[in-house]
From Swiss-Prot:
Molecular-function GO terms, alphabetical: proton-transporting ATP synthase activity, rotational mechanism; proton-transporting ATPase activity, rotational mechanism
Protein's membrane topology: Single-pass membrane protein
Assembly and oligomerization: F-type ATPases have 2 components, F(1) - the catalytic core - and F(0) - the membrane proton channel. F(1) has five subunits: alpha(3), beta(3), gamma(1), delta(1), epsilon(1). F(0) has four main subunits: a(1), b(1), b'(1) and c(10-14). The alpha and beta chains form an alternating ring which encloses part of the gamma chain. F(1) is attached to F(0) by a central stalk formed by the gamma and epsilon chains, while a peripheral stalk is formed by the delta, b and b' chains.
UniProt gene name: atpF2
Miscellaneous: In plastids the F-type ATPase is also known as CF(1)CF(0).
UniProt keyword annotation of Chloroplast present: yes
Name the record gives this protein: ATP synthase subunit b', chloroplastic
Species this chain originates from: Rhodomonas salina (Cryptomonas salina)
Location in or out of the cell: Plastid, Chloroplast thylakoid membrane
Keywords: ATP synthesis, CF(0), Chloroplast, Hydrogen ion transport, Ion transport, Membrane, Plastid, Thylakoid, Transmembrane, Transmembrane helix, Transport
Recorded superkingdom: Eukaryota
Amino acid sequence: MTNSLFLLAEGGLFDFNATLPLMVLQILLLMVVLNAIFYTPIARVLDERDEYIRKNLTQASETLAKAEAITKQYEQDLAKERRDAQMIIASSQQEAQEIVAMEIKQAQKDTELLVNEATTQLNSQKEKALQALEKQVNTLSEQIKNKLLSGQLAG
């Protein structure tokens, strides 16, 4: 019966002998070696990469914030310049309308003066013509009167 128990223990799941602690030592030694050779450099590279990415993300965020601030400032400046340009255009149009109105008034005054001068000249020429006609009428009347009187005296 002791033989049968011993046989059962040998063929069991675990054999409790000197190989089990050796296996544990091999696994621990493998973990230490892998940690020193493989995991530590990989962890360092991953940490460096993580730091690099974090640093670049921070710089990108700062650059993006600056770009947005500059864009906003440019948009504000552009809007202000557009308003100023529209005000300048409106004032220029107003000035142009005032200048045109003044020139139209001046042209109307000049036209009135020309019409008045022409009317005055025409009236003056009319008066001269009437005076000349009146002299001719008077002269002709005198001649007719003289002929009539001389015809009556002769006849």
